[in-house]
Amino acid sequence: MTDYKPLVIEQLEVMEAGEAGFKKRAYTKAIRSIRGMTVPLTDAAQVKDMDGVGDKIYKKVVEILATGGLAAANRIKEHLNVGGLKELLGIHGVGPVKAKELLDGGYKSVADLRAALGGKPDLLNPTQKLGLKYYEAGIQRIPRAEMTAHETALLSALPSSLTGVIVGSYRRGAANSGDIDMLVTYPDAMTDKAASTLFVSFVTALTSSGYVVDKLVSGPKKWMGYVRLGDGIPRRLDLLLTPPAMYGYAILYFTGSDKFNVAFRKWCLTRGYSLNEHTLTPVKGGDKPAPPLLLTEEAIFDFVGLRFVRPTERVDGAQVVAK
Protein backbone atom coordinates (compact mmCIF):
# COMPACT_ATOMS: atom_id res chain seq x y z
CA MET A 1 0.00 0.00 0.00
CA THR A 2 1.61 3.23 -1.20
CA ASP A 3 1.48 6.30 1.04
CA TYR A 4 1.13 9.29 -1.31
CA LYS A 5 1.39 11.85 1.48
CA PRO A 6 5.05 12.84 0.81
CA LEU A 7 4.37 13.26 -2.92
CA VAL A 8 1.19 15.27 -2.37
CA ILE A 9 2.91 17.58 0.11
CA GLU A 10 5.89 18.08 -2.21
CA GLN A 11 3.65 19.00 -5.16
CA LEU A 12 1.45 21.32 -3.11
CA GLU A 13 4.55 23.02 -1.68
CA VAL A 14 5.59 23.88 -5.24
CA MET A 15 2.16 25.45 -5.79
CA GLU A 16 2.46 27.28 -2.46
CA ALA A 17 5.85 28.71 -3.41
CA GLY A 18 4.44 30.10 -6.64
CA GLU A 19 1.57 31.97 -4.98
CA ALA A 20 1.11 34.96 -2.69
CA GLY A 21 -1.60 36.35 -0.43
CA PHE A 22 -4.75 34.34 0.22
CA LYS A 23 -3.91 31.70 -2.40
CA LYS A 24 -0.60 31.00 -0.68
CA ARG A 25 -2.35 30.77 2.69
CA ALA A 26 -4.85 28.29 1.26
CA TYR A 27 -2.04 25.95 0.23
CA THR A 28 -0.28 26.46 3.56
CA LYS A 29 -3.41 25.42 5.45
CA ALA A 30 -4.04 22.39 3.23
CA ILE A 31 -0.43 21.22 3.53
CA ARG A 32 -0.59 21.54 7.31
CA SER A 33 -3.72 19.40 7.45
CA ILE A 34 -2.33 16.70 5.17
CA ARG A 35 0.99 16.64 7.00
CA GLY A 36 -0.90 16.04 10.23
CA MET A 37 -2.46 12.79 8.95
CA THR A 38 -1.65 9.83 11.19
CA VAL A 39 -2.51 7.17 8.57
CA PRO A 40 -1.16 6.59 5.04
CA LEU A 41 -2.73 8.69 2.27
CA THR A 42 -3.94 6.14 -0.26
CA ASP A 43 -7.13 7.72 -1.59
CA ALA A 44 -7.89 11.36 -2.44
CA ALA A 45 -11.23 11.02 -0.65
CA GLN A 46 -9.32 10.99 2.64
CA VAL A 47 -8.49 14.70 2.30
CA LYS A 48 -11.76 15.94 0.80
CA ASP A 49 -13.23 17.29 4.03
CA MET A 50 -9.97 18.33 5.68
CA ASP A 51 -9.48 21.84 7.02
CA GLY A 52 -8.11 24.02 4.22
CA VAL A 53 -8.77 21.52 1.42
CA GLY A 54 -11.30 23.17 -0.87
CA ASP A 55 -12.61 21.86 -4.17
CA LYS A 56 -9.69 23.19 -6.24
CA ILE A 57 -7.00 21.74 -4.01
CA TYR A 58 -8.92 18.47 -3.72
CA LYS A 59 -8.93 18.14 -7.52
CA LYS A 60 -5.17 18.70 -7.52
CA VAL A 61 -4.75 15.87 -5.01
CA VAL A 62 -6.86 13.63 -7.27
CA GLU A 63 -4.55 14.49 -10.19
CA ILE A 64 -1.41 13.79 -8.16
CA LEU A 65 -2.62 10.35 -7.11
CA ALA A 66 -3.82 9.54 -10.63
CA THR A 67 -0.78 10.74 -12.57
CA GLY A 68 2.06 10.83 -10.06
CA GLY A 69 2.41 14.60 -10.37
CA LEU A 70 0.75 17.92 -11.03
CA ALA A 71 0.91 19.65 -14.40
CA ALA A 72 0.52 23.08 -12.81
CA ALA A 73 3.42 22.37 -10.45
CA ASN A 74 5.62 21.37 -13.36
CA ARG A 75 4.80 24.65 -15.11
CA ILE A 76 5.75 26.60 -12.01
CA LYS A 77 9.04 24.72 -11.81
CA GLU A 78 9.74 25.67 -15.41
CA HIS A 79 9.00 29.36 -14.97
CA LEU A 80 10.16 29.89 -11.42
CA ASN A 81 13.23 28.68 -9.64
CA VAL A 82 11.11 27.06 -6.95
CA GLY A 83 14.08 25.79 -4.97
CA GLY A 84 15.54 29.26 -5.02
CA LEU A 85 12.20 30.84 -4.17
CA LYS A 86 11.81 28.67 -1.10
CA GLU A 87 15.37 29.41 -0.04
CA LEU A 88 14.88 33.16 -0.41
CA LEU A 89 11.60 33.00 1.52
CA GLY A 90 13.57 31.43 4.36
CA ILE A 91 15.32 34.77 4.90
CA HIS A 92 13.62 36.72 7.67
CA GLY A 93 11.96 39.80 6.20
CA VAL A 94 11.79 38.49 2.63
CA GLY A 95 8.21 37.90 1.48
CA PRO A 96 6.88 36.41 -1.78
CA VAL A 97 6.95 39.72 -3.69
CA LYS A 98 10.53 40.52 -2.70
CA ALA A 99 11.63 36.94 -3.36
CA LYS A 100 10.23 37.01 -6.90
CA GLU A 101 11.82 40.42 -7.45
CA LEU A 102 15.19 38.97 -6.44
CA LEU A 103 14.71 35.94 -8.67
CA ASP A 104 13.84 38.17 -11.60
CA GLY A 105 17.06 40.06 -10.90
CA GLY A 106 19.09 36.88 -11.16
CA TYR A 107 19.55 36.22 -7.43
CA LYS A 108 18.57 32.60 -6.94
CA SER A 109 20.15 31.74 -3.61
CA VAL A 110 21.47 32.99 -0.30
CA ALA A 111 24.96 32.66 -1.75
CA ASP A 112 24.02 34.89 -4.70
CA LEU A 113 22.75 37.60 -2.36
CA ARG A 114 25.79 37.48 -0.13
CA ALA A 115 28.08 37.79 -3.13
CA ALA A 116 26.14 40.75 -4.52
CA LEU A 117 25.39 42.70 -1.36
CA GLY A 118 28.82 44.30 -1.05
CA GLY A 119 28.43 46.10 -4.36
CA LYS A 120 24.66 46.62 -4.04
CA PRO A 121 23.93 47.58 -0.42
CA ASP A 122 20.40 48.72 -1.30
CA LEU A 123 19.43 45.28 -2.56
CA LEU A 124 17.99 44.44 0.87
CA ASN A 125 16.62 46.55 3.70
CA PRO A 126 18.21 46.38 7.19
CA THR A 127 15.82 43.69 8.45
CA GLN A 128 16.43 41.52 5.39
CA LYS A 129 20.19 41.97 5.73
CA LEU A 130 20.07 40.58 9.26
CA GLY A 131 17.84 37.77 8.04
CA LEU A 132 20.47 36.96 5.43
CA LYS A 133 23.26 37.15 8.01
CA TYR A 134 21.51 34.61 10.24
CA TYR A 135 19.92 32.53 7.50
CA GLU A 136 21.50 29.20 8.48
CA ALA A 137 20.60 29.73 12.12
CA GLY A 138 17.08 30.83 11.26
CA ILE A 139 16.13 27.66 9.42
CA GLN A 140 17.22 25.41 12.29
CA ARG A 141 14.63 24.38 14.87
CA ILE A 142 15.38 25.03 18.54
CA PRO A 143 15.39 21.86 20.69
CA ARG A 144 13.21 22.02 23.79
CA ALA A 145 16.20 21.70 26.14
CA GLU A 146 17.71 24.82 24.56
CA MET A 147 14.36 26.63 24.76
CA THR A 148 14.32 25.88 28.49
CA ALA A 149 17.84 27.29 28.84
CA HIS A 150 16.72 30.48 27.07
CA GLU A 151 13.70 30.65 29.37
CA THR A 152 15.99 30.44 32.41
CA ALA A 153 18.29 33.16 31.05
CA LEU A 154 15.38 35.49 30.29
CA LEU A 155 13.54 35.01 33.57
CA SER A 156 16.78 35.45 35.53
CA ALA A 157 17.29 38.88 33.95
CA LEU A 158 13.65 39.97 34.23
CA PRO A 159 12.98 42.59 36.95
CA SER A 160 11.19 40.96 39.88
CA SER A 161 8.12 43.20 39.55
CA LEU A 162 7.49 42.01 35.98
CA THR A 163 6.07 38.65 34.90
CA GLY A 164 7.20 36.81 31.78
CA VAL A 165 6.18 33.66 29.95
CA ILE A 166 7.44 32.04 26.76
CA VAL A 167 4.48 31.27 24.53
CA GLY A 168 4.03 29.59 21.14
CA SER A 169 4.84 25.94 20.59
CA TYR A 170 7.10 25.86 23.67
CA ARG A 171 4.16 26.56 25.98
CA ARG A 172 2.22 23.85 24.15
CA GLY A 173 4.95 21.37 25.09
CA ALA A 174 6.49 20.93 21.63
CA ALA A 175 9.78 19.07 21.23
CA ASN A 176 11.23 21.98 19.26
CA SER A 177 10.36 25.55 18.27
CA GLY A 178 11.04 27.95 15.41
CA ASP A 179 11.87 30.96 17.56
CA ILE A 180 11.43 32.40 21.06
CA ASP A 181 8.37 34.55 21.86
CA MET A 182 8.06 36.02 25.34
CA LEU A 183 5.16 38.01 26.76
CA VAL A 184 5.91 40.36 29.65
CA THR A 185 3.31 41.99 31.90
CA TYR A 186 3.17 43.99 35.12
CA PRO A 187 0.96 44.52 38.19
CA ASP A 188 -2.26 46.47 37.73
CA ALA A 189 -1.04 49.06 40.25
CA MET A 190 2.04 49.88 38.15
CA THR A 191 1.80 52.67 35.57
CA ASP A 192 2.43 51.97 31.90
CA LYS A 193 5.37 54.38 31.98
CA ALA A 194 7.02 52.63 34.92
CA ALA A 195 6.52 49.26 33.26
CA SER A 196 8.06 50.51 30.01
CA THR A 197 11.08 51.82 31.92
CA LEU A 198 11.58 48.40 33.52
CA PHE A 199 11.10 46.69 30.16
CA VAL A 200 13.84 48.84 28.59
CA SER A 201 16.14 48.10 31.54
CA PHE A 202 15.45 44.39 31.01
CA VAL A 203 16.55 44.61 27.36
CA THR A 204 19.60 46.66 28.39
CA ALA A 205 20.62 43.96 30.87
CA LEU A 206 20.26 41.25 28.22
CA THR A 207 22.41 43.29 25.84
CA SER A 208 25.09 44.08 28.43
CA SER A 209 25.41 40.40 29.33
CA GLY A 210 26.28 39.50 25.73
CA TYR A 211 23.07 37.51 25.28
CA VAL A 212 21.83 39.87 22.53
CA VAL A 213 23.84 39.66 19.31
CA ASP A 214 21.70 41.85 16.99
CA LYS A 215 18.47 43.83 17.16
CA LEU A 216 15.70 44.25 14.60
CA VAL A 217 13.24 46.40 16.56
CA SER A 218 13.80 48.14 19.89
CA GLY A 219 11.13 50.19 21.65
CA PRO A 220 9.52 50.79 25.05
CA LYS A 221 7.03 47.96 24.61
CA LYS A 222 8.48 45.68 21.93
CA TRP A 223 11.88 44.22 21.12
CA MET A 224 12.87 41.87 18.30
CA GLY A 225 16.29 40.54 17.47
CA TYR A 226 18.79 37.71 17.74
CA VAL A 227 20.18 36.20 20.94
CA ARG A 228 22.66 33.48 21.77
CA LEU A 229 23.57 31.30 24.73
CA GLY A 230 27.36 31.28 25.07
CA ASP A 231 28.86 30.11 21.79
CA GLY A 232 25.59 28.57 20.65
CA ILE A 233 23.46 29.22 17.58
CA PRO A 234 21.89 32.70 17.28
CA ARG A 235 18.11 32.50 17.76
CA ARG A 236 15.24 34.88 16.98
CA LEU A 237 13.67 36.44 20.06
CA ASP A 238 10.53 38.60 20.26
CA LEU A 239 9.67 40.39 23.51
CA LEU A 240 6.30 42.09 23.97
CA LEU A 241 5.17 44.17 26.95
CA THR A 242 1.44 43.65 27.51
CA PRO A 243 -0.89 45.62 29.84
CA PRO A 244 -2.52 43.52 32.61
CA ALA A 245 -6.00 44.01 31.13
CA MET A 246 -4.85 42.45 27.83
CA TYR A 247 -2.50 39.79 29.19
CA GLY A 248 -5.04 36.97 29.30
CA TYR A 249 -6.02 37.58 25.68
CA ALA A 250 -2.40 37.90 24.56
CA ILE A 251 -1.22 34.70 26.22
CA LEU A 252 -4.21 32.82 24.79
CA TYR A 253 -3.58 34.12 21.27
CA PHE A 254 0.19 33.74 21.17
CA THR A 255 0.13 30.24 22.66
CA GLY A 256 -1.84 28.87 19.71
CA SER A 257 -2.08 26.57 17.93
CA ASP A 258 -3.32 28.31 14.79
CA LYS A 259 -6.11 25.78 14.30
CA PHE A 260 -7.17 26.02 17.92
CA ASN A 261 -7.26 29.81 17.73
CA VAL A 262 -9.40 29.79 14.58
CA ALA A 263 -11.91 27.43 16.19
CA PHE A 264 -11.91 29.49 19.40
CA ARG A 265 -12.65 32.72 17.50
CA LYS A 266 -15.44 31.04 15.53
CA TRP A 267 -17.00 29.85 18.76
CA CYS A 268 -16.86 33.37 20.20
CA LEU A 269 -18.67 34.68 17.12
CA THR A 270 -21.51 32.22 17.75
CA ARG A 271 -21.79 33.76 21.22
CA GLY A 272 -21.93 37.28 19.81
CA TYR A 273 -18.34 38.31 20.46
CA SER A 274 -15.25 39.02 18.39
CA LEU A 275 -11.92 37.88 19.86
CA ASN A 276 -8.38 39.04 19.11
CA GLU A 277 -5.07 39.21 20.97
CA HIS A 278 -6.13 42.40 22.75
CA THR A 279 -9.71 41.95 23.89
CA LEU A 280 -13.18 40.50 23.46
CA THR A 281 -15.79 42.84 21.98
CA PRO A 282 -19.50 42.49 21.14
CA VAL A 283 -20.16 41.84 17.46
CA LYS A 284 -21.26 45.04 15.71
CA GLY A 285 -25.02 45.15 15.43
CA GLY A 286 -25.50 42.50 18.10
CA ASP A 287 -27.13 42.78 21.51
CA LYS A 288 -24.35 41.48 23.74
CA PRO A 289 -22.99 43.69 26.54
CA ALA A 290 -19.29 44.46 26.90
CA PRO A 291 -17.56 41.64 28.80
CA PRO A 292 -16.28 42.16 32.34
CA LEU A 293 -12.55 42.49 33.00
CA LEU A 294 -11.09 39.09 32.10
CA LEU A 295 -7.49 38.89 33.30
CA THR A 296 -6.73 35.19 32.73
CA GLU A 297 -7.18 32.52 30.09
CA GLU A 298 -9.42 30.60 32.47
CA ALA A 299 -11.72 33.61 32.85
CA ILE A 300 -11.98 34.02 29.07
CA PHE A 301 -12.82 30.34 28.53
CA ASP A 302 -15.43 30.51 31.29
CA PHE A 303 -17.06 33.71 30.02
CA VAL A 304 -17.62 32.36 26.49
CA GLY A 305 -18.88 29.03 27.82
CA LEU A 306 -15.96 26.77 26.95
CA ARG A 307 -14.26 24.02 28.91
CA PHE A 308 -10.74 25.14 29.84
CA VAL A 309 -8.04 23.47 27.75
CA ARG A 310 -4.47 23.19 28.99
CA PRO A 311 -1.86 24.67 26.62
CA THR A 312 -0.37 21.24 25.89
CA GLU A 313 -3.75 20.03 24.60
CA ARG A 314 -4.47 22.94 22.22
CA VAL A 315 -4.01 21.12 18.92
CA ASP A 316 -7.02 22.02 16.78
CA GLY A 317 -10.73 22.72 16.87
CA ALA A 318 -11.56 19.36 18.42
CA GLN A 319 -10.62 20.73 21.83
CA VAL A 320 -13.02 23.71 21.61
CA VAL A 321 -15.85 22.15 23.63
CA ALA A 322 -18.74 23.71 25.55
CA LYS A 323 -18.48 23.30 29.32
Where are the predicted features?
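Double-stranded DNA-binding cores of transcription factors and transposases
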Residues: 1-36
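Accessory alpha-helical DNA-binding modules that contact the DNA backbone or grooves
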Residues: 23-180, 184-221, 234, 248, ...
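Preference for bulky hydrophobic residues occupying beta-strand positions
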Residues: 182-184, 225, 239
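Non-catalytic surface loops within mature trypsin-like serine protease
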Residues: 186-188, 229, 243
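Short acidic-hydrophobic surface loop/beta-edge motif
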Residues: 221-231
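Conserved, surface-exposed functional patches that form binding/active-site neighborhoods
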Residues: 231-270
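Acidic, low-complexity intrinsically disordered tails
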Residues: 307-323
